[in-house]
A protein has these predicted regions:
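A small-residue-enriched
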Residues: 1-3, 139-213, 238, 316
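Sec/SRP-type N-terminal targeting helices
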Residues: 2-32, 54, 79, 83, ...
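Residues at alpha-helix boundaries and short interhelical turns
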Residues: 5-8, 47, 71, 75, ...
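Outer-membrane beta-barrel translocator domains and adjoining extracellular loop/strand segments
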Residues: 9, 122-124, 182-188, 217
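Charged, solvent-exposed faces of alpha-helical coiled-coils
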Residues: 10, 17, 21-24, 35, ...
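Periplasmic alpha-helical coiled-coil/stalk elements that build and connect Gram-negative outer-membrane
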Residues: 29-146, 243, 250, 293
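Short segments within alpha-helical structural elements
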Residues: 90-115, 264-320
């Protein structure tokens, strides 16, 4: 029979592991929430890209129809029509590819939520998400740190449990036997007589070098858990700072596009169309200008997605 200290130590290990299982579940929920947010942002991004590609497809289709008409009238050559057809075909292929990517993201969203319902994102205006208050003295994600702290508690409890195995044990026993024949007292005993005896002893571990080695190994596990906590904290702080710096860089680009870039792209697009239809520029100049205008709008949408991804990462690192 072990002393209560031994059983209490074993119970503590089980209780700490039990607590850790709930923290693991909370971590999975936390990670799932971030993944859903990233996929949802991706779907909104695809919607915005689709609008831009449809706009480009419409303009390139008009250009193709005009080039085809000019060719029939002998006002242009085959190269202009081929260029127009190529631009229109590229826009169509990009739309089809985008739709496939969007279907994959929709399936991923439904898979992550996993409640048997098919989900899609709302067709809302695409803009920058809300960023929670920034804290220069970021101290790490509470949920992740709790789990790392709990790992330390488990290893501490296991060390105490291994040490408890060196504690003495109580040995209790009862013997019951029969004897047939003459006993030491020269009396005759038949098989119906039973003789009982008992013993009480204390077991003290003497050859315990193996267990002491186990204890030393557990001390190493204890140090590993402590190091993992410190490394986890450093990693969280580095992630936060990296995402914050990338967000600030992207936010500067977004400001440029919103204040200047988008207005310039619309101005280029409008002016290029007017000059081309009035015969002031040729189709090569028009193609260059229109492509440049759409590239500005395309980059703006890309930067919006990247900025929102960083906001999701930053908010997630601060939330539980």
């Amino acid at each position: 029979i072990r002393l209560p200290k031994f059983y209490n130590a074993q119970k503590t290990v089980l209780m700490e592991e039990y607590k850790n299982s709930f923290l693991h579940l909370d971590l999975q929920k936390w990670q799932l929430k971030k993944e859903i947010s990233l996929v949802y942002n991706e779907l909104n991004y695809f919607n915005e890209k689709k609008k831009l590609l449809k706009k480009a497809d419409s303009i390139f289709t008009q250009y193709f129809n005009r080039a085809d008409l000019r060719l029939k009238k002998g006002e242009s050559n085959l190269l202009e029509k081929a260029t127009a057809e190529n631009l229109r075909s590229q826009a169509e292929m990009q739309l089809k590819s985008l739709e496939k990517d969007r279907e994959i993201s929709i399936q991923k969203l439904s898979f992550l939520i996993n409640d048997g319902t098919f989900y899609q994102n709302e067709n809302a205006k695409y803009g920058i998400l809300n960023l929670e208050n920034l804290n220069a003295e970021y101290a790490g994600n509470p949920l992740v740190l709790k789990q790392l702290e709990q790992e330390k508690n488990i290893q501490n409890a296991k060390l105490l449990a291994e040490k408890a195995k060196l504690s003495p044990s109580l040995n209790l026993g009862v013997n019951s036997m029969t004897m047939k024949g003459n006993g030491a007292d020269e009396k005759y005993y038949n098989a119906t007589h039973r003789f009982q005896s008992g013993f009480v002893g204390v077991g003290i571990p003497v050859f315990n070098s193996a267990q002491k080695s186990v204890i030393e190994a557990q001390k190493v596990n204890q140090l590993i858990a402590e190091n993992n906590y410190q490394l986890g904290l450093i990693n969280l702080k580095n992630q936060y700072l990296q995402n914050l710096r990338q967000f600030q860089k992207l936010n500067d680009e977004i400001s440029y596009y919103q204040k200047t870039g988008l207005q310039n792209s619309e101005s280029i697009l409008k002016t290029a169309n007017n000059q081309y239809f009035n015969g002031e520029i040729n189709y090569l100049e028009w193609t260059l200008l229109v492509t440049q205008a759409f590239e500005i709008q395309n980059k703006y949408i890309d930067r919006l997605k990247e900025t929102n991804d960083k906001i999701i990462e930053i908010n997630s690192l601060k939330s539980e």
